[in-house]
């Protein structure tokens, strides 16, 4: 997984899903804190595809400490 294929690292505090204005924290909030499925997240954020939602969740699952700090816990 090449992170640059999926995300735009604008600043250390601003990581967005490539090709969108959606920050990864919005998707991960729905996944981590609300228990939403990837399908429900894609429906909520209509500009995102499943091919964008899944890598965002995978990035979190593979890097829980780093991404957890980014999203605030």
Identify the function of each model-found stretch.
Residues 1-17:
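Short, Lys/Arg-enriched N-terminal segment that forms or immediately precedes the first helix
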Residues 23-73:
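Long, charge-rich, low-complexity alpha-helical segments
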């Amino acid at each position: 997984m090449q992170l640059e294929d999926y995300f735009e690292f604008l600043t250390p505090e601003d990581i967005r899903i490539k090709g969108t204005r959606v920050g990864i924290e919005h998707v991960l909030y729905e996944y981590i804190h609300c228990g939403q499925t990837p399908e429900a997240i894609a429906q909520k954020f209509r500009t995102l595809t499943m091919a964008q939602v899944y890598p965002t969740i995978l990035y979190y699952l593979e890097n829980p400490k780093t991404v957890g700090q980014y999203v605030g816990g």
